[in-house]
């Protein structure tokens, strides 16, 4: 009886550890109404909550080499993650496409100025409550905010002159910021992470909502389970994931 219980527990823990280390690349499609009958396409690679994980060659091989933009949805790192690990991860992601990054609630534990220097070294852009045009897609802009834990979220600044774009990708680490934005602006695509999908779920039940992608009349919203873990390197019912969103417009 004891041996059976022990074997069962160890099997579950092994399953949870394996789930946390998976390199799942989840693919989504978003069709945006266009007078030109969808003659343009943009591919967005989105990854959030990397924490202590490596962006390695095995993951890179799974990602389409024609992605147009890489968006890191916060929690690139946390306390105890080496600067060399952070630098390597950004270097590897920057081989795919231009990198845009938003702060998560744990990132500054690894050193704010150090992260800024790494981003600058690889030509990556930090979205500090601001917006920029997306290279190769001049009618599209990307906007992002700081993390709410800093009390420096400025949605108004992040959307300043936003009407210069026909379409906007809006990213913030925490989903609650997306809900605030929706009260007075409707981006074409919204992205967030932070929740880890609850990380450990029993059936439908978890401490936080499981990640999902929703579309509605040419607009999309993605809340990711995230790629890494916090506290314990285990997952159940909310597997590690990153995303490629193919937008036809």
Tell me what each language-model feature is.
Residues 48-52, 69, 74-76, 105-106, ...:
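Active-site metal-binding loops of divalent metal-dependent hydrolases
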Residues 40-127:
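Membrane-embedded segments
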Residues 44, 68-69, 140, 167-169, ...:
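Structural motif
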Residues 175-249:
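Conserved beta-sheet core of the metallophosphoesterase superfamily
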Residues 117-124, 136-172, 178-180, 235:
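Binuclear metal-dependent hydrolase catalytic cores centered on His/Asp/Glu-rich metal-binding motifs
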Residues 64-65, 90-96, 161-164, 182-185, ...:
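Short, conserved loop/helix-junction motifs that constitute active-site signature segments
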Residues 1-38:
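N-terminal membrane-anchoring alpha-helices
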Residues 29-45, 124, 131-144, 164, ...:
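Beta-strand-turn-beta hairpins that frame and shape the catalytic cleft
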């Amino acid at each position: 009886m004891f041996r059976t219980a022990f074997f069962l527990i160890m099997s579950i823990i092994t399953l949870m550890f394996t789930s946390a280390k998976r390199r799942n690349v989840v693919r989504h499609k978003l069709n945006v109404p266009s007078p030109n009958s969808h003659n343009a396409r943009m591919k967005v690679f989105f990854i959030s909550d990397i924490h202590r994980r490596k962006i390695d060659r095995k993951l890179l091989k799974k990602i389409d080499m024609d992605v147009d933009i890489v968006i890191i949805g916060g929690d690139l790192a946390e306390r105890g993650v080496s600067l060399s690990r952070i630098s390597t991860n950004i270097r590897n992601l920057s081989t795919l496409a231009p990198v845009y990054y938003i702060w998560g609630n744990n990132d500054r534990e690894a050193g704010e100025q150090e992260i800024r220097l790494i981003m600058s070294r690889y030509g990556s852009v930090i979205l500090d409550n601001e917006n920029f045009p997306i290279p190769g897609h001049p009618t599209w802009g990307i906007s992002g905010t700081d993390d709410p834990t800093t009390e420096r979220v400025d949605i108004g600044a992040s959307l300043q002159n936003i009407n210069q774009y026909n379409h906007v990708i809006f990213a913030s680490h925490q989903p609650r910021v997306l809900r605030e934005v929706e009260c007075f602006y409707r981006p074409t695509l919204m992205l967030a992470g932070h929740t880890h999908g609850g990380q450990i779920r029993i059936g439908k039940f978890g401490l936080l909502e499981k990640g999902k992608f929703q579309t509605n009349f040419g607009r999309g919203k993605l809340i990711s389970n995230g790629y890494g873990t916090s506290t314990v390197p285990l997952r159940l019912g909310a597997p590690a994931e990153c995303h490629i969103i193919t937008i036809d417009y």
